[in-house]
């Protein structure tokens, strides 16, 4: 591994201090560095690495921008995923999809072919399971390619440190990098942030609450791997099956807590942060458990997730952020976020990850007579579109744009809460950042013949958290 990636792990204060200096320097990069896009051309080409549902959605968001951008290469480890995404995107965008067979790449090194199909000023989309994020980002930096990467971007301390180090190189090359934490591009939340901090409508922020309580989500719960002679598309090996069921495995997604709750955690930390600052909790404690370990048909689930989480995050000034997550059929659904201050409160996301209307209230009772402000229909925008608008504008006009440090810290904060619940310990953000356990340390070496990063026992069950018993690692 490169010496650059073996640097002494940073603590939280050093990172925040350093990142502040880097951001300050990058603000001058447009003056000091050459334009990143080809002179005389606004055409941006895009390569899609990871052709699942979110990958197809990100490519669609990219091609919906002015210009318009064109999709020129695709990569995945599953042929049927690539074919499905290609057909769907070709039907929708026709002439904007220019991906002949020789620019369709299959395999664990397929990302190299896709990125090599681009020129400087173009964009690689990374929407694979997060274990591969640093691998793909490193190669894009080497090739001088701009990036859009999906959240979360890390699931453990070692990959968080690695991504922060890699991003120093991306900044030095003036690369533009977007991260799929789209809440900060939602207009109603941008207006709410201003009303909280510039207008002081609810006073000092002291409490935040996020709830994502739904039924079965994604691939969070998995029955036993059916074996090599299975009837699934492509007859996947255990490694390939785990990739296809990525929500079930901490190495591939950070598990359900990380993948499903990162948006609320990110935008609530934003609501705590004054303009120009990025505040994150300093510690967390939490509880969680798995009530049901069988499918409705009575077959055992073997994944690594809990079905309920309740995490308390604490900020340096004592403010609290509570994040409650539940994946349970028949339970009351809740999918909202709230901010409480010394004078009143706010609804951040009324529904979903960041859907409005957002609103502010005097006091802490939600009522029409207490309402001070609510966002209007003009703010019912699409943040997935907005984040690409910002990225493509930065590329074409050489504006500073790099969301990786924030993406890493939002992902790390989410992992902090998950770790606290899985171990039943109070854990600091410094401890999480500097933890030595890496879920998939050889992600850059995986091939179709590789064993899966986490192995089942003789009965087909994967190692799961045991709070209070396993306290130094999550399993």
State where each predicted segment sits.
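N-terminal Rossmann-like dinucleotide-binding module
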Residues: 22-96, 268, 471-475
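Predominantly a Rossmann-like dinucleotide-binding segment in NAD(P)-dependent oxidoreductases
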Residues: 50-55, 173-178, 183-303, 311, ...
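Loop/turn elements at helix/coil->beta-strand transitions in domains of secreted/extracellular proteins
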Residues: 42-45, 67-70, 100-102, 119-124, ...
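Glycine-enriched catalytic-core subsegment of oxygenase/oxidase enzymes
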Residues: 61, 68-75, 89, 280-475
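A structured beta-alpha segment of the ubiquitous adenosine-cofactor-binding alpha/beta core
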Residues: 92-126
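Beta-strand-loop-alpha-helix segment that lines the small-molecule cofactor/substrate pocket
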Residues: 130, 134-185
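N-terminal secretory signal peptides and thylakoid transit peptides that target proteins
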Residues: 3-23
């Amino acid at each position: 591994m490169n010496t650059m990636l073996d640097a002494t792990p940073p603590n939280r204060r050093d990172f925040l201090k350093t990142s502040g200096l880097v951001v300050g320097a990058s603000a001058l990069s447009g003056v000091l560095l050459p334009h990143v896009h080809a002179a005389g051309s606004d055409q941006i080409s895009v390569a899609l690495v990871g052709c699942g549902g979110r990958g197809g959605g990100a490519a669609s968001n990219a091609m919906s921008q002015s210009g318009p951008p064109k999709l020129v290469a695709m990569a995945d480890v599953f042929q049927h995923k690539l074919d499905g995404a290609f057909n769907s995107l070709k039907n929708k965008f026709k002439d904007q999809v220019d991906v002949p067979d020789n620019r369709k790449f299959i395999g664990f090194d397929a990302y190299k072919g896709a990125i090599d199909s681009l020129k400087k000023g173009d964009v690689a989309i990374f929407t694979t399971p997060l274990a591969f994020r640093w691998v793909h980002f490193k190669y894009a930096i080497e090739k001088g390619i701009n990036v859009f990467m999906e959240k979360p971007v890390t699931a453990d301390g070692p990959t968080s440190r690695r991504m922060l180090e890699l991003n120093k190189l991306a900044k030095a090359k003036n690369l533009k990098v977007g991260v799929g934490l789209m809440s900060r591009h939602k207009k109603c939340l941008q207006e709410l942030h201003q009303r909280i901090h510039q207008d002081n409508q609810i006073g000092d922020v002291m409490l935040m609450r996020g709830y994502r309580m739904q039924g079965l989500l994604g691939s969070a719960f998995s029955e036993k791997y059916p074996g090599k002679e299975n009837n699934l598309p492509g007859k996947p090996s255990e490694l390939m099956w785990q990739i296809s069921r990525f929500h079930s495995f901490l190495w591939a997604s950070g598990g359900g807590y990380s993948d499903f709750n990162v948006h609320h955690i990110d935008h609530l930390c934003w609501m705590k942060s004054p303009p120009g600052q990025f505040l994150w909790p300093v510690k967390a404690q939490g509880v969680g458990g798995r009530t049901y370990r069988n499918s409705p048909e009575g077959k055992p689930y073997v994944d690594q997730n809990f079905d309920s989480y309740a995490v308390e995050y604490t900020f340096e000034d004592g403010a609290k952020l509570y994040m409650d997550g539940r994946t349970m059929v028949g339970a009351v659904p809740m999918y909202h976020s709230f901010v409480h201050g010394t004078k009143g409160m706010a609804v951040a996301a009324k529904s979903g990850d960041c859907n409005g209307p957002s609103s502010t209230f005097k006091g802490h009772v939600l009522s029409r007579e207490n309402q001070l402000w609510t966002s209007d229909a003009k703010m019912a925008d699409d943040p997935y579109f907005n984040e690409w608008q910002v990225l493509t504008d930065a590329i074409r006009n050489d504006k500073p744009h790099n969301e990786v440090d924030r993406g890493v810290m939002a992902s790390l904060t989410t992992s902090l809460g998950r770790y606290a619940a899985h171990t039943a310990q109070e854990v600091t953000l410094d401890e999480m950042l500097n933890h030595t356990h890496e879920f998939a340390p050889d992600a850059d070496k995986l091939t179709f013949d590789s064993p899966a990063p986490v192995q089942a026992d003789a009965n087909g069950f994967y190692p799961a958290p045991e709070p209070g018993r396993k306290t130094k690692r999550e399993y």
